[in-house]
Amino acid sequence: MNSVLGNQTDVAGLFLANSSEALERAVRCCTQASVVTDDGFAEGGPDERSLYIMRVVQIAVMCVLSLTVVFGIFFLGCNLLIKSEGMINFLVKDRRPSKEVEAVVVGPY
């Protein structure tokens, strides 16, 4: 029971003290550099290999998202182009050439 009370007062003293040593202990206490594995060796932050793998995965995800956006814009543009051609053809079918134009075209040949 006294050890628990002692630990609480140590922590309170750590944060209430104005000395640089107390601040240093508080910072060391809560960083990844102070994590100790079962073997007794301190484990640092993520190693180079895991950072490389994370970077490759990020690049792959960004490439897939970029391709999705590019193809989405492309197919949307194609769809709009097809619809506009259909509307133009609809308007062209409504126009009828006059019979005089046909007579002139057929005449000289």
Swiss-Prot record:
TM segment ranges: 56-76
InterPro entries on file: Reprimo_fam
Subcellular location, record wording: Cytoplasm; Membrane
Glycosylated residues, chain numbering: 7, 18
Positions carrying Phosphoserine: 98
Membrane topology, as annotated: Single-pass membrane protein
GO BP annotation list: regulation of cell cycle; regulation of mitotic cell cycle
Keywords: Cytoplasm, Glycoprotein, Membrane, Phosphoprotein, Transmembrane, Transmembrane helix
Domain of life: Eukaryota
Role of this protein: May be involved in the regulation of p53-dependent G2 arrest of the cell cycle. Seems to induce cell cycle arrest by inhibiting CDK1 activity and nuclear translocation of the CDC2 cyclin B1 complex.
Family note: Belongs to the reprimo family.
Protein name per Swiss-Prot or TrEMBL: Protein reprimo
Organism for this UniProt entry: Rattus norvegicus (Rat)
Gene expressing this chain: Rprm
